[in-house]
């Protein structure tokens, strides 16, 4: 059994990271899940949420937006729409997006076409704020 996982994360715009890591935690569509070296092969979907990985005693966080995770032979491939490290999140902009989404949701009902889009925007903003607020590694 390998001691490390090879983690690769890709968005349509760029390769976000390639790292040798000790473990990951991801926001699966059916709930949060973790992967350690020697994990059973897996293909699953991700939802908007906080993705983290550990290297030694350091933990790194990213805000991710919908995608897929494939685990095979101590390799974890993550394909997501967007991924932002905590260092790249503009906290003021995320808070402004949260305020806009909250205000717009107060004006809408679940029957409105825009309602679910605004709920998704609210969730993305909340995750970005959470990740940015981590205040550095680990």
From Swiss-Prot:
Signal peptide: none annotated. It is found in: Cell inner membrane. InterPro entries: ATP_synth_F1_dsu/esu, ATP_synth_F1_dsu/esu_N, ATP_synth_F1_esu_C, ATPsynth_dsu/esu_N. It is a peripheral membrane protein. It holds the Pfam family ATP-synt_DE. Keywords: ATP synthesis, Cell inner membrane, Cell membrane, CF(1), Hydrogen ion transport, Ion transport, Membrane, Transport. GO terms for cellular component: plasma membrane; proton-transporting ATP synthase complex. Its main location: membrane. One of its GO terms (molecular function) is ATP binding. Belongs to the ATPase epsilon chain family. F-type ATPases have 2 components, CF(1) - the catalytic core - and CF(0) - the membrane proton channel. CF(1) has five subunits: alpha(3), beta(3), gamma(1), delta(1), epsilon(1). CF(0) has three main subunits: a, b and c. Produces ATP from ADP in the presence of a proton gradient across the membrane. This is ATP synthase epsilon chain 1. It comes from Syntrophotalea carbinolica (strain DSM 2380 / NBRC 103641 / GraBd1) (Pelobacter carbinolicus). The lineage of its organism: Bacteria, Pseudomonadati, Thermodesulfobacteriota, Desulfuromonadia, Desulfuromonadales. The gene is atpC1.
